[in-house]
Amino acid sequence: MCLKPKLDYESDDFQWLEEKIKEKQRGGNPLTDKEKERIRLELDIIKKTNTAKVFLLYDDIMSHLKEVGAVFHGMMHCSYVCYLLGLTKVNPLHYGLPFERYYNEKRRVLPLLNIVVPKGEKESALRILRETYALTKICPIIDGENRYAFSNELDELTEEDCYRQKLYAFVLEEAEIKVYRLFTDEEIYQKALEYFSRRNISLGRRYQSDKQVEKIFSETDGRYIYQEQFFEICERILGVSNKRADEFRRALAFRKREDRDAIKQFFCWKLDEEGAGLFDYIYFGHIYVVSKAYILGLLFLDLE
């Protein structure tokens, strides 16, 4: 990460991050043992990986973008430190989101920063970041959906550049989601194949729940699957409890942004954990492809 946050402090990065966390805790309710243990775990990983400056940078960026209503998306919702800093409204302890999904000692790259701004505020956000951090280039991500990134090194960026740490931050503009459905249509699947093949993402076989999926789809004759059947799939394939299904239902109704974001991350993690085969997860492509070819365009597809 090459952005230089304008922070007024003399202590080292990790000490300053600890101080900011303690400051956020003052005046609040006493921490539970579970909360203390989670903070200790996250700070231990942050210290071992020497990434405190990244979290300070995220905090600094958000302080500048609050005026345009920006929020952070992505795996940041798995971090209790980010929650304490006010960077996300999602309490990962409430939703059972593991920090290891956001960052761990085995990761070779830094977590990517997804900044989402309300419709019509993208240019304001780009201007603020350009002026604040003296960035000279704003690059569209090749094959991206209205995504922009900052780089003083490259004239254009690819997805691969993100994983080479040439990417500073995504800036995305909120898109209106008009359609909620689960599709099993072959035509939709072919479109998904084309979509991912353009990004060199393989849809090869790497799942462990084929028989369960096939049984569910044979019972529905391969027709569209609606919400109640989706919860049944979650319970049967992923072992999701009734309580968790209720959280899914609330989140998918778009009643709360933080619920929706947290459930996405839980779902994403659970699939990885169970080996059910999450192939890709793209916020503004509105596409999930999970398990077998049968479950397609899961959760968000804008059909306009």
Residue ranges and their predicted role:
Residues 1-304:
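Alpha-helical scaffold/interaction cores of sigma-54-like transcription cofactors
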